[in-house]
Every structure is written in C-alpha cells, then in structure tokens.
Amino acid sequence: MKYLTLIFALLVFTVSAQAETVDYRVSGDVNPEFQAITLTLDPDMSTFTGVTEIHLAVAAEVSRLEFYQSGLSLESVVLQQGEQTWPMTVKAAQHDIQHASTGAKIAPGKYVLKISYQGKINDTSDGAYVSRFDGRNYISTQFEDMHARKAFPGIDEPDAKIPYQLTISAPEKHVVLSNTPVSTRNVTDGVQTVYFEKTKPMPSYLVAFAVGEFDSVPIEGLSIPGRIYTPKGQSQDALFAARRTAEILRYLEAYFGQPYPYKKLDFVAVPTFTHGAMENVGLVTYRSEILLRGENPVLAEQSTPLMVIAHELAHMWYGNLVTMAWWDDLWLNEAFASFMAARLMQDLYPEHNYETRLVAERAFGPDAAATTKPVKKTVRVAADVMDGLGLNYSKGEAILHWIESQIGSDAFQAAVREYMTEFAWRNAKADDLWRVLTKASKTDVGSMMRTYLEQPSYPLVVFDVDGEVQQRRYHLTGADVPEQAWTVPLSLKLKRDGKIVTQQILLNAEQQTFPALTNADWIYPNTEANGYYRWRIPQQQLTAMLQDLDAFTVREKKALLYNAEALLNAGEMGFAEFMSVLEALSLQKDPAVARSVVSVLAGFEYLIDAENEAAFGRFVESRLIHWFDALGTVDREQDSDDQLRLRHSVFGLLSKYSDNEAVQNAANDLATQFLSNPQLEHRQMAARALRAVAQRGDEKWLARYEKALTSSRDANVKSVIQRALNFKGEKLMLAVLDLAMSDTINPADTMSVISAIAMVQDDPVPFYAWLSKNLELLAKKIPDYHVTRIPQYVSRSCDADTIKLADELYSNVAGAYEGMTRGWEIAKASSEQCVTLKKRYQTTFNAYLTASSSIK
C-alpha cells in the first residue's frame, strides 16, 4: 500500500467534468423550506384530490415562481405572505416546469405557495398508482426518478431536500402508510384522516404513501417500530424477511458508526412493481416475490431477498441521509448501496459465497458498446436517467470495490464515515466523495476514478514479453470508437524462475515500459480480479499460465475465462486460443468455476442456427453431462450455494439444446410437477424446465401454463411461468401476446412476457406485424421506463433482415415516445455488432463443432 500511495501522487490523466446546464431545472433564486401535502385517496377510485402548501424563501426579486407538475389538474394556485394573498396564473414550460405569476414582481422574503389540484391514480407503476390482487386494489407510489410531480406539485429535484408533512384521508377499512409514524387519526362517517409526523429533510422522490387492505407482521428485533405490510392474506409469507431485517440493519449501523437515522422502518410488498424495490424513507416498497418467500425458504431462495433488503437499507445512508445533488450522480446512491449489500452478504451470509462473484462482469458487456454513455452524464429528463441505468449499479459498484482493494478497507470505511457525518441531511457530489477518500487514504483517488466515470468504457491493457505495456479502449470487433486513456493501477501476479510474486505498477500513459515485468513465465495482470479493465498477454505466457491453474483463486480463474471471451469478441484472440482456455477451465472441479464455463458456453448462442443446433447440443452435452449426472435435478439441503447454482445452470443449458433422453425426461417431469403443484423450493429448476418445454411445446402445454398462471396467488410462481412463455410459431406466439396484453399480466410484468416470446421466433415477420399494430396500446399499459426500452427488450437480433424489419418500424414510430429513439439506437448497434461477430466466427465455430463431434 505504501507503493500505491506514492504512485497515486503521480496521476496525470484526468477528464474534465461536464459543464452544468440549467435550462431543464427550476430557478435557484427560490428555495423550498417545507412542504405540507393533504391527499384524499381511495384505491377503488381512479382519481384523487390534493392540496399542498410549499413554504418558499425568495432570495432575490423574481417575476415568477417555478415548480413541477405532470398530469395534474390545477384548480387553484395562490401565493400567501402573512395575511396577504395573490392569485397566480400558471403557464406550462418545458420539462414539466410550471411558471406561476402574480402579474407583478415578487420581492425577496418568505412565502407560501398553496395549490389545490386533482390527479389520476394510474396503473402503470409510476407516480401514485394502483395494484390489484385477489379482487382488491392497493395504492402505492414510485416517485424515483421524476415521478413525484405526478402526485403533487413541488420542487421535484434531489437537491431540494426539505421536511414534508403528509395528511391522508381514505375509507376507514384501509391501512394508510407514509414515511413517518402516525401523529393522529380521526374517523368520521367511515372516512379516516391520518396525520403523519413531519419528516426529516429529504428529496421529493423519497416521499411515499400506501393505502389498502394490508395485512402485516412485525419486523423482529428493531430498536424502532417496523412492520412488513402485504396484500391481504399473505403476511405469513413475509416471515423470513421479518426475521432477517434487524441483523442487516445492525450490520449497517456498525459499518457507518451511527444509528439508523429515521423513526420507523416499514416494508410493503407491492403486487405490481416495475423495479426490485424502492428505498423510500421509512416505507420501503418491494416487488411481492422478493419479500414473500415464506418462513423457511431453501438456500437458493434466500440470497435475493437478503441482498435486496441490504441494498435498500444501505440507501438509508447512501441516498437518503446523504443525497446526490443531481441525477448525473445517481451512481453515488446505487453503486454504494450495491457495494454495501455485497460486503454485507460476504460478512453476514458467507454461505452464499458472494466473495467469488465478479460484479465487474455485469458491467463490462454494456459498458463496451460504442453507444454507451458515461456513468456521469448530462441528465435532463427521466429517459436520460434510465439510459444506461444498470451501469450506475454494476460499474459503480465495481469501481468502489476496486478503490477499496487499492487503499485498504479500513481507510475506505473511515472515508465513508466522514462523508456521512459531513453531508448528513445534505446533498453531495462525486468530488465530495473523492475528497474524503483522498484524505483518508492519502492517495489521489479522484484523478483516477474520473477517468472511469466521466467517460464510457474501460481500457484493454496489453503486455509484451519485453516489459512494454500499452492501453487502448476495449471495444468489440469492428466497432468504431474514439481513442481514450485511463489511469490504471495494476496489481499483478507473475511467475519468474519458478517463483510466484506480486507486483504493483501504475499505467498512466498510452505506452510505458516496466523492466520488472521482463523474463516472466507468465503475468496475471489483475490479482483477485479487482480491477476494472481487460488484459492481454503474449500467447506463450497464456499457454504457460494454463499449466499453473492451481496458482490462482476461484475469482482469478473465473476472470481468466471471461477475459478470454472478451478478447475473442474484440478480435484480440483467435478462436483456437480461446478454446484452449475454455477446455482447460472446463476440467476444474470447483462449482463456481464450472458455472462460469456454462455461462461462456451459453454465450455461443448467437452462432446457433437450424443447421448446427444438433451439433452444438452434442458439444454441450459432452462438456456438461458429467455435472448433470453428478448433481441430478433435486436441490438438496446439504448443497452449497455454488452447487445449487451450478445444478440450475447446467440443467438450463442442457435442457435447451441437448436431446439427451434423461435430460428431456427430467424437463418434462419437472414442468409437469410444478404446473400441477408449484412449490417454492423447486422454483429454480422448474424455471429452466418450463423454458425448455415451452420452446418445443404445443397448444396443450400452453393451456397448462396459462391455467397454472391464472390460478396461482403466489407472485413467485407467476414470475416463473411468465418468464417461460417462450413458445414458438405464429399461432402460439399470438396467443401469448394476447395473454400479455390482458389483465392476467400486470403492467410491470408485461414486457418480460413479450420479450420471452419475441426473442425465440424463427420468423420475425408476424411479431413485427403485431407490434406495429399494438404498439400504442402496449405503450399505454406499461411503465414509462419500459416504453423507452421496448427496442432493447424485443428487437435485439443477430440477423440483418430482422434488423431491417425493426428499423422500418422504429424509424416511423420511435419519435412519438420519449427515449425510444435512443432505445433503438442502442438495440440496433448491439444487433449490428452481433452480425459482425457472427460473420467473423460462424465458419470457424461450425468447423470446431464438426471436429468435436468426430472425437470419441
């Protein structure tokens, strides 16, 4: 670490921050200080009424006030100061901004902006919306990122961090929830009015409420009140989450060195939910299937709820207590929450073996695309936030993990604690984080990290035998990308004269020579796979490395294989050389390494067609059947998490491609059993079986799937079946699409059904005919976030004719939907890249399959 401290001081590569623009934000001369919101809500009504009072401080004379609203009907807008009242006229501007004027200048001072309005309870999973379950309606909210303005007028920006006070009237039979404890509750003529305590300062996107006939169970062991609320009749399915939440919260309090900062902690299982969960202050909302895993779920069903709960509770500090100043730093929230959740899983639940999971691998693929934007980018509208949203989580988390590995966990934790203390109840920017990390570690963290967060992609680091090291932007073969440079601290493992040693160097130019790297038998350039870069070494070193695989950890073995796959896709490694890596690692016995082999084999799917599918099936069987024979199809209590996951992935790939009788019989049996008597403990294997059966299934099978789907009350069962409706052929496809558009499939799940069916059709023409006819209806049903991404869900292809078909559709219609043009740009570029790769490797791949089938 001392060496790193010195070399970090020499960092020279930086990227200038983007210039801030404010045409899409309200004026900074008027600042909110407090907001009261009074709502009248009924889950059985499609509209609601509201009154809000926004307390404002006007710093300089202005001609108008500005606030946000979207889809609301403003009935009265007045400005108050003491006993004086001025009616205001309101004109809509861009970006949902409203200009309110009294007709005269507004002098500096304190004012109250009072607005009476009506709004709509939608069913598309954003704003204030309704979910339906078992014949009952439930209102919940999703205000991140720019959807609070759909429920109440206000300063809907993350740096407008103020206290709120909510008052909600609703029919007496309903449970009414919000961010804070109830202050008082009055009931008159069957209508309750619930007054909630004032909140701590928070941004508008964290305001939340829920109304419905909820059941609940207490969250055990908390120092503050807390319950899990579920749709009626499902509270007992929340017991696992209820009994694990307190230990998760205690871990986070210990790490941050301060107690949970709010007065209560409630969870709500929401039947219709676009994302996984939402970290609303004191009222965290989740997709039902995440929270409702029963009392004692099997090991395979535990990691998702634990991880998601940890992520959301980490947000109580990262994001809620300390909030990013604007949406261009959303990664500060999401990356830190993901980082903390993974650390917690390693420390608190080692049985899930998070230590061997490579988060960077989730980011490398999308980050390599020529269309990818930086994590820190200009954000004007909601579609900009969602553009590349996943990299806020995965790339951001990978970068934080890398920083921690470089400066040490103690220094990292000290910086986090200082950051939380300094910016509590305030907003922060990335530079604020870099400053405290630099102070705690005595290393210039910011100079390096800006090169990764303020420009897209990452470096490919190339080593030569003479110690020369070069860097250039990693990209897929044939892609046209600009030249870029990064500051790359490299932690190396190398073998020389029979001894394995570690070495740390700093690559801060496009090309440098390091004499310490000469005459090595091999160099492994990414110790413990902590760094965020790809690498290439001379072929003779790679050959020698494959003879020394026992010298590497599980993380390093997995990263070696994934790195080789990346080099193949970039045209930086030949097919034969890549297969030598794959074949060597396929002999490894560790289940985590074996699962990476399965993943890479599945990555060949873009090269599979009707002519070589049978040969590929035989090839996959030859590499994996021994695992199938050893692991079987039944999850056992004594299995490790890695064994469980390997069983699932092996069976998933074999059942899709292999004609092995035992495999196909197992798929039919598992599918039949699950459809007739779905059990959560068999869900993971059943999911693979159902997908395998569907791709060969007929009308009778589809009828069985639909019957099981419509008769189940279990969100997890529904999720499995919905994602397995990948039936082939026009007739079955149209039947599934009709199902997707019906009330059987809720708006948040509609695109998962449509994507599953669209991506498996041999003939794309009928699907695009359907999409062209039904796009408007589809866009009205699904969440806005899904509308922008329709091309990415259904139009990724590796066929030039299909790309042309999609292009004809989107060139005519995408402009009518915010963000869809960008969505098609991403999907089209990805598809064209796939065509390029297919042309490059198809002949070689077919020859390899032929040669492999001839080897006995």
What are these regions (language model features)?
Residues 18-49, 75, 133-138, 158, ...:
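N-terminal, polar/Ser/Thr-rich
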Residues 24-27, 107, 116-165, 212-220, ...:
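Glycine/proline-rich low-complexity spacer/linker segments in large multi-domain proteins
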Residues 50, 140-144, 154-310, 339-342, ...:
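Hydrophobic helix-coil surface modules that form long, contiguous segments used
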Residues 53-71, 165-171, 431, 475-491:
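Surface-exposed beta-strand/loop patches in extracellular or lumenal glycoproteins
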Residues 71-133, 188-189, 511-518:
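A surface-exposed beta-strand-loop module
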Residues 73-80, 445-446, 458-526:
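Beta-strand-rich binding/interaction modules
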Residues 74, 82, 196, 222-482, ...:
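Hydrophobic alpha-helical and helix-loop surface patches within well-folded domains
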Residues 361, 390, 470, 481-482, ...:
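Long, ordered, helix-rich scaffold segments
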